[in-house]
Amino acid sequence: MLDLKRIRTDFDTVAAKLKKRGVSEDTLTHLKELDEKRRALLVQSEELKAERNIASAAIAQAKRQKEDATQQIADMQKVSADIKTIDNQLVAIDQQVTDIITVLPNTPHDSVPVGADEEDNVEIRRWGTPRDFDFEVKAHWDLGEDLDILDWERGAKVTGARFLFYKNLGARLERALYNFMLDEHIKEGYQEIITPYMVNHDSMFGTGQYPKFKEDTFELADTNFVLIPTAEVPLTNYYRGEILDGKELPIYFTAMSPSFRSEAGSAGRDTRGLIRLHQFHKVEMVKFAKPEESYQELEKMTANAENILQKLGLPYRVISLCTGDMGFSAAKTYDVEVWIPAQNTYREISSCSNTEDFQARRAQIRYRDEADGKVKLLHTLNGSGLAVGRTVAAILENYQNEDGSVTIPEVLRPYMGGETVISPK
């Protein structure tokens, strides 16, 4: 959430930054006008309360002296009525301010490319060379069925579209991947966490999913619970409402969890395969950092995601998302996209973001600066390390062989009991 004081004191800068994200200046102008009206009413309210206190003292004195206080009482009742009217106006204005400021996106960092959509994203670097196949490549969903390791038909029967069963070496490959990912992140100083798979609405607000993106989630009816769309939500909210010791920062968390997404607005997109599911496993990275260190930590986090792909031998590229393609809470985002041969393109497999103090303000996560003893908002970062199902898809397609088998990447073999290949039955 943006700082209302910042909007008030640096309006033109904030308006210019949010314009790059498609926010009309009229919206900010209305917010500023509401804030000015609210502050004026607060002054009026305080002045009237001072009058009421004086009148109350005069009434008390008149009564002690057995004097008639009828007029003073009438005057005080009028002042009290005026205060109540102003208080009601303040409640209404506060709600309007909240309704606006809670759905304003984060302001982009100055290094973020300006653009409308994914066409304006900027490629930063590539790693690896896509394999030159001398046979016709199969899509991962066909490979999964032919190898009897992925079962979409029964997933649809048991649950519905965009669900599946992993079987046999497919299940072991999925498990091997997330164990490998967690182990790699632990080597880099991340603390492994097992989170709840449900969170409350306050947690969803804290990380920015609520109130704007409710339609993308699965809520449990008649409860305060929501199935997590990503482990970012419980990991970031771990410290919600707390003040951390600045000497402890930065703090790194990692967790593997299922992610549940309604995929509202995705009808007709990626209807086959592992790219877009309602339920999928993902290894998440979350950091809590001092403001002056957060962009260095973003580079490290992105490198942590890249490390997984490099050790798996999967070609990828890193993209800096433009202002029109970034997520709601992000100030800057790098997408890491893995090569998918059957689609002849790169697809997102990790998204690493610095939200600066946007989530920390919503969730009230602060730290005490050891230098001056002051309590300040910290910066939060999050990233996929990686989306496990998409990594399975990338391995199946990039490591497929002409005979229909798939070679298991060398780094995963110790996690799979020494298996080296997944062969057709």
Swiss-Prot record:
Give a Pfam family name.
Answer: Seryl_tRNA_N
EC nos? 6.1.1.11
InterPro entries to which the protein is assigned, alphabetical: aa-tRNA-synt_IIb, aa-tRNA-synth_II, aa-tRNA-synth_II/BPL/LPL, Ser-tRNA-ligase_type_1, Ser-tRNA-synth_1_N, SerRS_1_N_sf, SerRS_core, tRNA-bd_arm
The kind of enzyme this is, by top-level EC class, is ligase
Superkingdom, natural source: Bacteria
What protein family does this chain belong to?
Answer: Belongs to the class-II aminoacyl-tRNA synthetase family. Type-1 seryl-tRNA synthetase subfamily.
What does this gene product do? Catalyzes the attachment of serine to tRNA(Ser). Is also able to aminoacylate tRNA(Sec) with serine, to form the misacylated tRNA L-seryl-tRNA(Sec), which will be further converted into selenocysteinyl-tRNA(Sec).
Known partners and oligomeric status: Homodimer. The tRNA molecule binds across the dimer.
Please give the name of this protein: Serine--tRNA ligase
Question: Could you tell me which species this protein originates from?
Answer: Streptococcus pyogenes serotype M49 (strain NZ131)
